[in-house]
Amino acid sequence: MNRLISVVGPSGVGKTTLVRALAQTGNFATALEQHAERPFQALFKQDQRYGLANQIDYFLFRAEQEKELRAASKIGLIDGGLDLDFHCFTRLFRSRNLLSEPEHDLCRRLYDFIRADLPRPELIVRLVADEGTVAARLSTRDRINIARAEDTALFNSFLEEWLASVPSGQVLNVDVSHERLDYKVSKRIILERVSI
């Protein structure tokens, strides 16, 4: 079973861009969110009754990706992932009343069931950026966004709460507020951490 690295942070911080930059080194097998391909994402953006279906789809999709990455010949690298989808996005959607309390509980039960059979990532790379940077990056994205720039502070509070339960040696905080989009500095930090 191969190692797995999850890159986490709020929407717009640069998770997918960093994963793509790291993939160019040839050292990683990668998995991306694939917003456009997810069958309920656009529906959820238009109608909140698709929120539960969207979350269940993402949980299953991310679990499938983790299994594939664990079986790959290279270190696995995923943007976001199962844990971020539950601990942050599901809680955010509940706080915005896009999911009911029973729907949130169903998501928790499904997450716990899936995670019981899949080991957690060995390393979580948390991308940190000021809210202005996140808002600017989010505004230039050409994809479906359910999380909004104004959600960043609340999202980060959920992220901090979750990461407080993870052993500190498994979390690498990387400030990308002033990082260029080639992520040269961040790539070096991460490659050194995983000894590549």
What are these regions (language model features)?
Residues 10:
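P-loop (Walker A) phosphate-binding loop of NTP-binding proteins
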Residues 24-70, 88-89:
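Conserved substrate/cofactor phosphate-moiety recognition/catalytic segment
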Residues 88-158:
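A glycine- and Lys/Arg-enriched "phosphate-lid" helix/loop adjacent to the NTP-binding pocket
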